[in-house]
């Protein structure tokens, strides 16, 4: 009988030990998972650049949904929650998220986050282009990522802050950055070579919003537009009339319309000038997953290819 109770006791102790060890193992696993830093970015373009560098080493949340306008946005409760718990926050800067309704400023202030401690502009180091005739702070053209050289600056700034916040993975981040920079740089050089072949009198990119100034400077292609920035009036009769008048004096073969804006004003321009809309292109957002342009690299490649084909046809 005593021997029987002994065996039961030994079995009980063994089971208790197994439960304890499994519990410790799960706790360690949870601790490893919890070591991932929480990163919040303001839009899908920054999310993709960050993902290329950090991969699965971080918990990543992007605020403005794919296809939506980051100029003026109303954060959802989940955005507020993720921002308050974020270890690191990346935003474009250049008045993109802080102009208009200043949604980002309100978001980080309410979360008690501090600039250059908790949140960082990825555009630091970019040569700023301003809205026409407005060379003052708060009047920056924010669309710097449409020049691949600036996309590389964004990536380097993101890697720098990731490595500071998470030094355990800094070699991983740097390795991924180097690969990504080469990929973007190769595409940039290919584009410059192709656009140099187009006759000067056929070079002009016409879009709805005047968001291609950085692109124009990078690839030596003049730009024209209906309205200058999405936070102002969009597609008024006078704006359309002024662009139509300008285009009638050109030999332009193609117009373009952005994926994130109403295409009706550009359709009116096309009808009044006889110049066809060649393609939709990407500006403020990548495409939906699985579609052409669903990453920063692929949206830029799409833009470069479509604009080249439209101008060279």
Curated annotation (Swiss-Prot):
Membrane topology of the entry: Lipid-anchor
Domain of life, source organism: Bacteria
The keyword rRNA-binding appears for this protein: no
Binding residue positions for Zn(2+): 71, 143, 209, 284
Keyword annotations from UniProtKB, A to Z: Cell membrane, Lipoprotein, Manganese, Membrane, Metal-binding, Palmitate, Signal, Transport, Zinc
Example of a GO cellular component annotation carried by this entry: plasma membrane
CDD domains (UniProt xref): PsaA
Annotated GO MF terms: metal ion binding
Signal peptide: 1-23
Any one biological process term the GO annotation gives: cell adhesion
PROSITE patterns: PROKAR_LIPOPROTEIN
Any Pfam family: ZnuA
Similarity remark: Belongs to the bacterial solute-binding protein 9 family. Lipoprotein receptor antigen (Lrai) subfamily.
Function description: Part of an ATP-driven transport system for a metal; probably for manganese.
Classification via PANTHER family: HIGH-AFFINITY ZINC UPTAKE SYSTEM PROTEIN ZNUA-RELATED, METAL-BINDING PROTEIN HI_0362-RELATED
Protein name as it appears in the record: Metal ABC transporter substrate-binding lipoprotein
UniProt source species: Lactococcus lactis subsp. lactis (strain IL1403)
Gene that this sequence comes from: mtsA
């Amino acid at each position: 009988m005593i021997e029987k109770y002994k065996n039961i006791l030994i079995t009980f102790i063994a089971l208790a030990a197994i439960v304890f060890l499994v519990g410790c193992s799960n706790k360690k696993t949870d601790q490893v998972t919890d070591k991932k830093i929480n990163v919040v970015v303001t839009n899908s373009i920054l999310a993709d650049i960050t993902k290329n560098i950090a991969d699965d080493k971080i918990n990543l949340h992007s605020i403005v949904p794919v296809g939506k306008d980051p100029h003026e946005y109303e954060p959802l409760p989940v955005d507020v929650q993720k921002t308050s718990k974020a270890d690191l926050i990346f935003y474009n800067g250049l008045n993109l998220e802080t102009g208009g309704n200043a949604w980002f400023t309100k978001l980080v202030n309410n979360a008690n986050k501090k600039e250059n401690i908790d949140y960082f502009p990825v555009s630091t180091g970019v040569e700023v282009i301003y809205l026409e005739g407005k060379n003052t702070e708060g009047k920056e053209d924010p669309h710097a990522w449409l020049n691949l050289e600036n996309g590389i600056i964004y990536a380097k700034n993101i890697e720098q802050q990731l490595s500071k916040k998470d030094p355990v993975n800094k070699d991983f981040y740097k390795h991924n950055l180097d690969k990504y920079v080469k990929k973007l740089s190769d595409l940039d050089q290919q584009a410059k070579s192709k656009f140099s072949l187009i006759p000067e009198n056929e070079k002009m990119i016409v879009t709805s919003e005047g968001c291609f100034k950085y692109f124009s400077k990078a690839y030596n292609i003049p730009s024209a537009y209906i309205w200058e920035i999405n936070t102002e009036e969009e597609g008024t009769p006078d704006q359309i009339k002024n662009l139509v008048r300008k285009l009638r004096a050109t030999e332009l073969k193609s117009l373009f319309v952005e994926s994130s804006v109403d295409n009706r004003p550009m359709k009116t321009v096309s009808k009044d000038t006889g110049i066809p809309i060649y393609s939709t292109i990407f500006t403020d957002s990548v495409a939906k997953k699985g579609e052409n342009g669903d990453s920063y690299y692929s949206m830029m490649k799409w833009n470069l290819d479509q604009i080249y084909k439209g101008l060279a046809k």
